[in-house]
């Protein structure tokens, strides 16, 4: 698995999250996305949770995020933050990111986007206070390994 690869990115991802929140005065991923001029569309995406891609028309590049409107509001918030993570962390990589409902192995970019999104969902203080990874993972609908990494980063 690629968990060791993101170890050196932990501060960058965390610092990126905090700098965005400071710059935009909110931790609402939808508000940040709109302020960045990213096009957001909610639609029935079937088994897909969300999608980030770019579209080039007449030498103008548009950044687009599509979110499945069948997701709960919590899942939509997480998916918005996840796709924002792709925009922030992987901009210019010429990759299209499609988030499916299935639990397939994650690429480095998916792990990074999940880690980034987790900061929008649960704070370091809450993780320290609760200190129960299974509870955090289930309550906040986060990947257990992401919760492990967050806890590891807090105490290391």
Name each region found by the language model.
Residues 1-156:
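Active-site hotspot residues in diverse enzymes, especially metal/ion-binding acidic/histidine motifs
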